[in-house]
Every structure is written in structure tokens, then in C-alpha cells.
Amino acid sequence: MGRAFEYRKARKMKRWGNMARVFTKLGKEITIAAKEGGPDVETNPRLRILVQTAKKENMPKENVERAIKKATSKDYTDYKEMNYEGYGPYGIAIFVETATDNTTRTVANVRSYFNKHGGSLGTSGSLEFLFQHKCVFHIVKKDDMDLESLELELIDYGVDELEEDENEIILYGDFSENSNIQKYLEDAGYEIASAEFVRIPNDTKEVTAEQREQIEKLIERIEEDEDVQNVFHNMKEEEGEE
């Protein structure tokens, strides 16, 4: 489950081409978290993890500080987090997460992307059941780590899958367990390199190379929109990427 998500994420980062898009997305998340839970990372767990994620992505410290200050400034932009769901070409389910200061503009734009690329925007919540909403934690791997023991240790706190990467361990849990997992990892002294929320499809749909090209054009167009934070889909990855 998780490995395919990591491949999708890597391809998305490659499509974005430069870090400016990543910084914009993270900046919005940081501002929203600081507005909701306060600007102090010591008392705001969500902000704390986002700042750590920004560090991993090499986001400049001044960008992070500016995003936090934006939450308490008189010029604060009131972002609303809205989800849009629809079907792309060939029945591929697409779930779009946005953070916008103008929902009328955003929904009109997203609908136009679907329409122009052979898809259709559905009603809110209509496709949510096709995806598992997960929290993902990347923790720094230590030489003496026993993965089997670690998995048994973490299962009581909501972790339901664990994967080993080159320099880190990737943990997956249900979205609702995010706070429990983060608190335990921090209290137990694990170093969290980054964390994020994802939607992983329950099942994936096979497509031809030509169909894939058409679907990816729609996904790329949606991702280019500045209001869009994440795009998830249930198209099966190409051979060798599962």
C-alpha cells in the first residue's frame, strides 16, 4: 500500500520541477496550523511537525517564519480547506484537496479542468469511500533498530503499516490516530523527519499507456492551480512502480 504511494509522491515532486511549488504548499499549511493552534511550536503539535517537514524539504527558515507570522498579522488570508471529488477520463477517481481564500473561484477552476479533460466533478463526499485517509510519519533510522519490535511497539498507538527506506522508517496509520502516533513518537524520543496526510486508494484501476497520458494531463493541470494542495487518484501505477 505505502510503497506505491511513495512512488506517486516522487513523480509528483518531479512534475512540480522546482521547490517553489513545494514551499507555497507548505507555507499555506504552516499558516493554517499557526492560526488554528497558535504560533508556538512547543504547544502546537501540528505546527511543530510541519516546521520539521519544511526543514526536510530545505524550505528557508525565513519562509517558515514568515508563514507563521502571517497567521497573526492584520493582513491574514483566511484560507478554507475544501475537498473536491470527481471522475477523470476512463472512470479514474480523483480526490482534490485545496486551501483557498475564494471557494467560488476554486470550484469553478477545478470543474473546468475536469470538463476540459473528459472528466466530471462530483458532489462532496461522493468518492471518499474509495480512499483510506492516512497519516504518514518518516522517522530517522538508527543502527540498532529492530523493525519487528518497533512494529509491535507502535501498533498499540495506531500504526498499521511500517516500511524501511534507506535512511528512515515510514509509518502509516489511520488519519484519526495522527495525534496519538505523534505524541508517542515524540515522548519515546524518536526523531520525526517529516509527516503528512495522504489518501491511498482501496483498489486501483488499470489503464493503457495512451489512457494514462490523458489522465495525467488532467492531474497535472489540477496540480498547477495555486489553490490545490494535493491530488490523489486510483489509477494503477506503471509496471515496476508498485
From Swiss-Prot:
Q: Which InterPro entries match?
A: Integrase-like_N (IPR017856), TACO1_YebC-like_2nd/3rd_dom (IPR048300), TACO1_YebC_N (IPR049083), Transcrip_reg_TACO1-like (IPR002876), Transcrip_reg_TACO1-like_dom3 (IPR026564), YebC-like (IPR029072)
Q: What is this protein called?
A: Probable transcriptional regulatory protein PG_0097
Biological process terms in GO annotation: regulation of DNA-templated transcription
Q: Where in the cell is it found?
A: Cytoplasm
Extract the HAMAP family matched here: Transcrip_reg_TACO1
Q: Does the keyword Metal-binding apply?
A: no
Keywords, in A-Z order: Cytoplasm, DNA-binding, Transcription, Transcription regulation
Q: Which family does it belong to?
A: Belongs to the TACO1 family.
Q: Name one GO cellular component term.
A: cytosol
User: Would you say which domain of life the source belongs to?
Assistant: Bacteria
Q: Which GO molecular function terms does the record list? A: DNA binding
Could you confirm whether the keyword Transcription regulation appears in this record? Answer: yes
The record's listing under NCBIfam families reads: PRK00110.1, PRK12378.1, YebC/PmpR family DNA-binding transcriptional regulator
